[in-house]
């Protein structure tokens, strides 16, 4: 957990000068596995020899209520490097395929009754994503991706 927070802090510090760039965005998303999430993404192309690379900080949460007494919660936070594939794959200018790889920390909570009343745990691992963004307007993108925390996901990104 401390490694993730340290990495997020460093990413924000090193990309803070890029906050005014038009390709930075904040996004919200929802998956078909009932995961809700949000992310901040900062363009670091200038720091990466003008490669189409960005840093994404994300938070995702899943809650399943099994009955009136039992609830399972999973929350993930992390950081990922995102590579825009438009320099490799020639598509419409409004379409931006991408892939990403990063680290995430996941916390689990089981609340219930009986022999196993409560359980909490923390784990960490790789975060893998790939998808496509479609520019609706210069300020709004639709984002469709597949990742290993939430599965098939749809969302919207708002550039700042």
Predicted feature descriptions by range:
Residues 63-107:
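Mid-chain, structured segments of secreted extracytoplasmic proteins
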